[in-house]
């Protein structure tokens, strides 16, 4: 029983039904978000019971979230729009692989769960080709199921990889010592990923009669929940620009991959005590920052400096921050647990590149970050939606940033979404021992993105962040005492 695949298809009344998507769903990055939950298996759990548990988990989850059984397809119109459709030959897919078996153990070369834990679950051991399969990116006309899960058994752990997909994108594989969830933005955003995984975790616990943690997921009309500002124009969106001919949609990087070498994903950690100290230092010259504001300002300064950006070539640096806009919406209000996308626009802070070495940087940068986050309100979302509905294509505009080779950064702010507090049940170690995320196809591609994770088990309120750059940049960060005063490198 080395490999088993099960497809959970929609019931006949659902076949042919369509979920219409809204403008923010259409503009959301068409790339994969893969989340990794590292869970430790109980010593006496059997392979048969794991298979039964994860099969039941998916079966129950798709009853609560039917859109997990949809397929992402093109609407075949001139606007390059997507939709979610219930098809009779597709659905949510679960694959179980036992990498402890004689036939498959040679394909898993990274040892036990303890070995991964000792290395802090490094990205270079999270190989997608090992942990999820079934999509050929060259098959352009093949529809992609919304949810695919692969449960990978390794010594001492289960690598459960779940992914929500989108059409015409490369298929993402993940590696982790326990569980990986993967979400594509067309299906839902980061909070939607959490809602999906919370539902899976609830059914994985297998004690629903004692469960009181149900989340009231709201399946509102995605196509109409945002009222577009039809009077908005592109000049009202300085953080967006038209896509140039031949340019890839929402890909703010320009480089020849053959010229790059030594690319790495590094994990850094800042303790709860150091976060407090950092806030104290910044508060001496300005309003006391939140932990997120302080950490974002710190990362922004030291990463840009480590990249040796030439101020004469790039006089300004931008920092984009992801924002969940649900609570900021009005007319109509958007429910806290709305299923869909409220991930655009990003908050964008700006600073002169020459200012990154000034003594006043932290006070100025913190103010810029705070102001940028506050500016992502209902009006900002409605302006973006209004421009999108007027454009000839949903893919006609892109972020007005240059993350490579330019100086701009994006921080994906997941630290306030309680992924690491999800309880998978005692057989799966309760809460995960680590949480990892990949967004898009990051292998061999520096893209100026940082991911800030929620606190790990045993870390208190300390936070891990992932940075992906070439080795020379990371080496300069590691040699920067102003950075290592706060952050330690884990992998």
Where in this protein do the model-derived segments appear?
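Flexible, P/S/T/G-rich "lid" or insertion loops adjacent to the active sites of thioester-utilizing
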Residues: 230-287
